């Protein structure tokens, strides 16, 4: 069973080689690896060539813009009946694809995810804390905050494995400010796909706050708000509040845009149904220093995943 692995990259050949190496070490050997670049990049081309494996191909994205466009371009060149995605600064554990394919064989149609080991400059932990079980809307799982300093749900593109035909129903929105989230939301709520999670750590995500990244571009709070309004028809009121006060609100606070404070509170209550945690988190972002929030997150972090 051929799996096409799509890796968008941008002038980071050493990180890319780590990512490619983790794919080539997979116990599932039927692989098609597509590295996508936005523009001619001799160093990346040289790195790919140095791998010396015919399964690794370099593709130039004909419509360069975002990681979403690069992922779509990679899918257009894919030969596999299954697609998987990997950011160039992340890596997989060797049995990632084997375990997900086995899981998918009895849970179709589905996007199959897994647990991740998150590595930051100051800590290492497992995420998500709560495994999605399809008993609640996917948007509430991702955004309906049930704790003050950190949500408990996550589905990230480096963990994705799904059938090619299912990907073609949705594809990534190249105009989206949050394309990973939107892809999962539309896959579940519009295409009717299940989201399944292998309850094992199979991906390592490296989060380095000062490192520029191609696949996790940071948008302004106003761009995130426009995105939220564009997907409001498919969101529950609870999820709308969570995104408005959590995602958009935290970005506005980081930007110091004080006029956003009343506007976002109004929208959250007008179009959503906020929990107390949504409001407390929103206020905390505006009223407490970032270093203090980090310390508390570390103290309150729950160890180990649980069912949703």
Model-based region annotation:
Residues 61-78:
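Glycine-rich, basic loop-to-helix element that forms the pyrophosphate-binding segment
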Residues 53, 69, 97-166, 217:
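Flexible acidic/His/Gly-enriched loops in nucleotide-sugar-dependent glycosyltransferase catalytic domains
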Residues 21-30:
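Short, acidic, metal-binding catalytic loop of nucleotide-sugar glycosyltransferases
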Residues 201-209, 213-243, 259-271:
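Catalytic core of nucleotide-sugar-dependent glycosyltransferases
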Residues 83:
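Short aromatic/hydrophobic "clamp" motif used to bind/position activated sugar donors
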Residues 136-220:
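Conserved nucleotide-sugar donor-binding catalytic segment
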Residues 26, 41-43, 253-308:
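Membrane-interface aromatic/basic loop that binds lipid-linked glycans or pyrophosphate carriers
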Residues 41-50, 91, 95:
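Acidic helix N-cap motif at the loop->helix transition within catalytic regions
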């Amino acid at each position: 069973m051929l799996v096409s692995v799509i890796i968008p990259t941008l002038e980071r050949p050493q990180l890319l080689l780590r990512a490619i190496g983790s794919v080539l070490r997979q116990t599932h050997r039927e692989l098609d690896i597509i590295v996508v670049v936005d523009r001619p990049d001799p160093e990346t081309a040289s790195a790919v060539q140095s791998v010396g494996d015919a399964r690794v191909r370099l593709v130039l994205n004909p419509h360069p813009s975002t990681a979403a466009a690069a992922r779509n371009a990679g899918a257009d060149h894919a030969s596999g009946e299954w697609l998987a995605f990997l950011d160039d600064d992340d890596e997989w554990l060797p049995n990632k694809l084997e375990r997900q394919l086995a899981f998918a064989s009895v849970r179709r149609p589905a996007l199959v995810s897994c647990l991740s080991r998150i590595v930051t400059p100051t800590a290492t932990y497992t995420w998500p804390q709560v495994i999605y079980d399809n008993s609640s809307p996917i948007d509430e799982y991702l955004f309906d905050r049930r704790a003050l300093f950190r949500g408990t749900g996550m589905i990230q593109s480096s963990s994705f494995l799904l059938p090619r035909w299912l990907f073609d129903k949705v594809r990534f929105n190249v105009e989206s400010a949050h394309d990973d989230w939107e892809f999962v939301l539309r896959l579940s709520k519009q295409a009717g796909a299940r989201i399944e999670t292998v309850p094992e750590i199979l991906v390592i995500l490296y989060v380095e706050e000062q490192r520029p990244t191609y696949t996790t571009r940071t948008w302004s709070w106003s761009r995130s708000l426009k995105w939220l309004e564009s997907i409001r028809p498919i969101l529950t009121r609870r999820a709308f509040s969570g995104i408005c006060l959590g995602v958009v609100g935290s970005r506005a606070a980081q930007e110091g845009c004080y006029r956003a404070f009343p506007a976002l509170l109004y929208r959250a209550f007008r179009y959503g149904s906020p929990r107390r945690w949504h409001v407390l988190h929103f206020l905390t972002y505006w009223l407490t220093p970032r270093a203090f929030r980090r310390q508390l997150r570390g103290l309150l972090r729950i160890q180990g995943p649980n069912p949703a």
